[in-house]
A protein has these predicted regions:
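An anion/phosphate-binding loop that grips the pyrophosphate of nucleotide cofactors and donors
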Residues: 52, 70-73
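Rossmann-fold NAD(P)-binding glycine/threonine-rich loop
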Residues: 84-96
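Phosphate-binding beta-alpha-beta segment of Rossmann-like dinucleotide-binding domains, i.e.
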Residues: 94-96, 102-143
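Short acidic active-site motifs
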Residues: 43-45, 61-66
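Short, acidic/turn-prone active-site loops that include or flank metal/cofactor-
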Residues: 12-13, 80-83, 103-106
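Short gly/ser/thr-rich secondary-structure transition/capping motifs
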Residues: 34-40, 57-59, 131-141
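N-terminal glycine-/charge-rich "phosphate-binding" loop or analogous flexible N-terminal tail
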Residues: 1-52
């Protein structure tokens, strides 16, 4: 029996462990799956993904053309909140489920938004420049 084949576009990666897919391997190693990085242009991606069991979609749109070329795909998965980069109608027509991670990075995004609000309100960038140029005593005009 051949290995379960996961094809993903080369380049963009959501993994924080580098490009070795350490986190993905935790889930895929028990089923003896292989991850194959394919070129990101559509024609070459199709050639590499034609016999894939799964597509890990990232970095390129997964179009109807790509989906229609998949001969044995069982799932298209995204490591993101949205699924707008995948032609859902085409995948549904082929009976291929599309999955995502609806709560990925939500705490980090909320933290970042609050940090930006506070830094804007307190004029953090402007005050940082003043401190670095020795103009700390001018801070009252900023606050």
């Amino acid at each position: 029996m051949s290995k379960f084949k996961v094809v993903t576009p080369k380049g963009a990666s959501f993994t924080v462990a580098g490009s070795d897919y350490s986190y993905e391997r935790e889930a895929l190693d028990p089923i003896d799956a292989e991850i194959i990085e394919a070129p990101a242009n559509e024609a070459e991606f199709i050639a590499a993904a034609k016999n894939a069991d799964a597509i890990y979609a990232k970095g390129i749109p997964i179009t109807k053309t790509i989906i229609d070329a998949l001969e044995s795909c069982k799932v298209i998965t995204l490591g993101s909140v949205g699924v707008d980069s995948v032609d859902i109608k085409a995948a549904t027509a082929r009976g291929i489920p599309v999955t995502n991670i609806p709560d990925t990075f939500i705490e980090e995004v909320a933290d970042h938004a609050m940090m930006l609000l506070l830094s804007g309100f307190r004029r953090l960038v402007e005050q940082d420049k003043m401190v670095r140029t020795g103009r700390w005593s001018d801070r009252k005009s900023v606050v």
